[in-house]
């Protein structure tokens, strides 16, 4: 299945050491009908994924460099930082090509296609549809977002009940990231990659060791810790559910 008129795709990355994760990810994504592409971090991963035929995969720049991710996978290791720089760069590159990209970690199991909700199109978005204006989770507010990120709160019902108090000021988890190919979406993802790969010397990003840390620092005031200083009232939920 191609990205089609929606120009939307899911993108994930992995090497041969997490091949079981990659195959499991692709199995569920394919069963759910999600347009997805796997960026192979090494040649071995590409060869094994390509041998399955139905998996859309390609060699990332690191695969051409015969790169290997060290066993520790510490965020402070040089090999991890190279991986993070490549990953953010590839996401940015696809967004710049005009595609809305949902970046997903490989250890996530997708049971349903998120496209109808994220793109807010088709029958699901119409009045009376699953994500229509009268739905508990209408898709229209998210459609206007240039960037969206998951949090460590895994329950949408809990989020609604709590009026998004944690989401508004908690830690943002880069395990699921949505970047739209809008002018602001393109600018943000380009800056995200820049701040991960080549942070300005002496900047707040220079000392950070992961793309998640960089993302959180980009959307918060300097020295504002997650959960401290953020608005904790129900302003976010009221904007989505004015009733």
Model-identified regions with their sequence ranges:
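GT-A fold catalytic core of metal-dependent nucleotide-sugar glycosyltransferases
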Residues: 59, 83-159, 169-171, 176-181, ...
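Catalytic core and acceptor-binding pocket of nucleotide-sugar-dependent glycosyltransferases
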Residues: 169-243
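A structural signal for well-ordered alpha-helical segments within the folded catalytic domains
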Residues: 23, 85-89, 209-217
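Juxtamembrane luminal stem/stalk of type II transmembrane Golgi/ER carbohydrate-processing enzymes
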Residues: 1-9, 21, 53-54, 124-128
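Active-site-proximal specificity loops/subdomain of glycosyltransferases
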Residues: 20, 43-97
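Glycine-rich phosphate-binding "P-loop"
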Residues: 1-17, 70-79
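Short, acidic, metal-binding catalytic loop of nucleotide-sugar glycosyltransferases
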Residues: 28-35
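Short internal beta-strands
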Residues: 36-41
